[in-house]
């Protein structure tokens, strides 16, 4: 396998079985800070609300969201905010300066704007959320913590994803791949050079993710980015375990989407063969396209 697209390797000493620790979705420190509303937090909240990049978000950021950011600043994960990177239906992503002077991405899910039913479709059936309730705030918190846990698991399995750094309530801090002035590009935005090689890297990442017990669930050229010749898988919030009742359906859809894109780019790719490659025995190394 070529390293032309910067394939990473699995972390040593990691083995994956069927063990899944339940993810706690109860109130965290950010909720307690928001309830206390001490003077330091109030002053921080007002400064943040007055910042230009947050003025348009005052109607959707509740006190607990500001408290989550406050706690992440206290813990040294965020030193200063930059501008917005992207604005989506459910979350906004901001550039920020991390505690080690590295650029980080801060993904803030908006409780009131998130698609509650869409999230529940991916959470129900996940063994990590067997006792998830119906409160909208709790569902969004579960979604964010699931994204953080999925990123950690994918990284250990040798899948190139943004490195997860910290999570508080509905706020996720992770590695920023590229910077605003030199941002990473979605594959949908570029003409892929050497599409066969790129396809082989992506399908290997899909197989590693599956062996780690996860299915991305929404993989396509819109959730694959490239920066400095490196392919990165993003948006793992909806990724489900292989035990999810819809895992096979999601995986087959991922395989079709990925294969169709790379075939249009000129690669020898087929959805059914990709599915066989991803789900094949660990000892197999077939090319999946014959």
Curated annotation (Swiss-Prot):
Residue stretches of biased makeup (Acidic residues): 11-22
Annotated region (Disordered), positions in chain: 1-22
KW Hydrolase (keyword) present: yes
Its EC number(s): 2.7.11.1, 3.6.1.-
Catalysed reactions, semicolon-separated: L-seryl-[protein] + ATP = O-phospho-L-seryl-[protein] + ADP + H(+); L-threonyl-[protein] + ATP = O-phospho-L-threonyl-[protein] + ADP + H(+); ATP + H2O = ADP + phosphate + H(+)
Annotated protein name in UniProt: RIO-type serine/threonine-protein kinase Rio1
Residues that coordinate or bind Mg(2+): 223, 235
Primary role: Serine/threonine-protein kinase that is able to autophosphorylate as well as to phosphorylate proteasome subunit alpha 1 (PsmA1) in vitro. Despite the protein kinase domain is proposed to act predominantly as an ATPase.
One Pfam match: RIO1
Signal peptide boundaries: none
UniProt domain Protein kinase: residue ranges: 79-290
Similarity field: Belongs to the protein kinase superfamily. RIO-type Ser/Thr kinase family.
Post-translational modification: Autophosphorylated.
GO molecular function, one term: hydrolase activity
Cofactor(s), names only, from the UniProt record: Mg(2+); Mn(2+)
Keyword terms: ATP-binding, Hydrolase, Kinase, Magnesium, Manganese, Metal-binding, Nucleotide-binding, Phosphoprotein, Serine/threonine-protein kinase, Transferase
Domain of life, per lineage: Archaea
Catalytic residues (positions): 218, 235
InterPro entries xrefs: Kinase-like_dom_sf, Prot_kinase_dom, RIO-type_Ser/Thr_kinase, RIO1_kinase, RIO_dom, RIO_kinase, RIO_kinase_CS, Tyr_kinase_AS
Binding site for ATP: 85-93, 107, 175, 177
